[in-house]
């Protein structure tokens, strides 16, 4: 009996150790060729590390990833295209990524608010016909960090939000750093509702941003467009604001630190007639906007006051006609000076207006240039009034 019990205990211990090895194998796998990578995906490995310098995953269809994993390219190059779906949380990082497929990555949403589909791209160099397509069909979060991406095909884009325009089911997208370039189309197409944030990045190519639905905020980013193609169907606008008829909202916020310029056409192409009952707004709170080679800031001026609101920024070289057209778009206390800068309106003598800066520090009196001490000015005005009453 004792011998039997001992054998049983040894067998259990052996199986436990074996399970540890199996679990460890399932958690991480080094891949050297296409077969290794296909096996790692089939086994749903939590960490996949590329060791081969170039691995062409030559499948006819998208490779579907519906499990949590980190794909570490480890400085190597992968040829493939993926679909991330069903609440999977996927990170792809540290290497080159290319494909002739269209798009290179498709992200499909999750039905579970507590378990969104997540795609994180870090330190990648991507070349593809088209880049990342995010479907507004469920809860989704996408982050693109310090990634260089080139979309090379006709009407190719680096990021596209597609599907529903009526409402945001929980689609959040962040681009932080990196360089996104589209050779023959818009860099970013917001065709479906989402919350998009772009900061500290560089965007460029034939055209910039297409806004048809959702909300996009951009700050500390360079957006430079130039289209040298003779094909008239390739867009040239740096920012095209054409709200979809059924969109719940179309809101573009251009904040401080942006450098936005166009060499081939107008910076803004706005179609306010397409709004209908849509909440549509372009809020310019800072940044510099330069239309080069004689191009206008706006492709057309009619109706822009219905969409554009300006509280900061600089527009060097703006024409008198455009400056006049922007007057209804300006906040009440500001104007555009002769150099194209947004500035406080000149005040009548003796009138004190306090304009807080971005750090909420008090700035100078726009009428005299003298520093403003809000409490001191208030007390002094009371003293002056009392003195006048005594007299």
Predicted regions and their residues:
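N-terminal hydrophobic targeting signals that begin at the initiator methionine
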Residues: 1-4, 391
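Sec-dependent N-terminal signal peptides of Gram-positive bacterial secreted proteins and lipoproteins
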Residues: 6-26, 377, 381, 385
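Sec-dependent signal peptide cleavage junction
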Residues: 21-30, 369-371
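N-terminal capping/linker segments that flank leucine-rich repeat
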Residues: 26-50, 342-344, 351-354
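N-terminal extracellular ligand-recognition/capping segment immediately after the signal peptide
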Residues: 32-37, 45-69, 73-80, 97, ...
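Surface-exposed loop/turn motifs in large extracellular/passenger domains
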Residues: 64-70, 83-153, 158-185, 189-264, ...
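C-terminal cell-surface addressing/anchoring modules of secreted/extracellular proteins
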Residues: 349-391
């Amino acid at each position: 009996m004792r011998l039997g019990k001992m054998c049983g205990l040894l067998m259990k211990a052996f199986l436990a150790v074996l399970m540890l090895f199996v679990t460890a194998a399932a958690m991480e796998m080094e891949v050297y060729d296409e077969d290794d990578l296909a096996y790692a995906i089939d086994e749903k490995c939590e960490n996949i590390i590329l060791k081969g310098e170039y691995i062409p995953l030559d499948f006819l269809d998208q490779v579907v990833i519906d499990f949590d994993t980190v794909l570490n390219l480890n400085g190597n190059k992968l040829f493939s295209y993926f679909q991330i779906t069903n609440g999977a949380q996927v990170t792809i990082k540290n290497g080159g990524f290319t494909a002739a497929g269209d798009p290179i990555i498709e992200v499909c949403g999750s039905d579970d608010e507590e378990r969104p589909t997540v795609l994180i791209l870090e330190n990648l160099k991507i070349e593809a016909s088209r880049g990342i397509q995010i479907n507004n069909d469920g809860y989704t979060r996408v982050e693109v960090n310090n990634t260089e991406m080139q979309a090379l095909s006709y009407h190719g884009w680096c990021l596209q939000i597609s599907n529903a325009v009526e409402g945001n089911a929980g689609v959040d997208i962040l681009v932080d750093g990196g360089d996104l370039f589209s050779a023959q189309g818009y860099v970013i197409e917001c065709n479906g509702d989402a919350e998009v944030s772009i900061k500290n990045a560089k965007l460029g190519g034939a055209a910039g941003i297409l806004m048809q639905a959702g909300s996009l905020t951009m700050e500390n980013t360079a957006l430079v467009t130039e289209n040298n193609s003779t094909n008239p169907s390739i867009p040239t606008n740096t920012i095209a604001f054409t709200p979809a008829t059924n969109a719940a909202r179309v809101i573009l916020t251009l904040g401080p630190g942006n450098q936005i310029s166009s060499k081939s056409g107008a910076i803004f192409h706005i179609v306010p007639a397409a709004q209908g009952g849509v909440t549509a707004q372009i809020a310019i709170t800072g940044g510099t906007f330069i239309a080069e080679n004689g191009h206008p800031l706006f492709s057309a001026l009619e109706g822009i006051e219905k969409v554009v609101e300006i509280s900061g920024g600089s527009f060097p070289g703006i024409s008198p006609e455009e400056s006049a057209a922007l007057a209804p778009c300006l906040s009440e206390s500001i104007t555009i000076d002769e150099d194209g800068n947004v500035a406080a309106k000149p005040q009548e003598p003796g009138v004190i207006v306090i304009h807080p800066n971005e750090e909420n520090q008090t700035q100078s009196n726009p009428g005299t240039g003298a520093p403003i001490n809000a409490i001191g000015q208030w007390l002094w005005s009371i003293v002056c009034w009392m003195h006048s009453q005594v007299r």
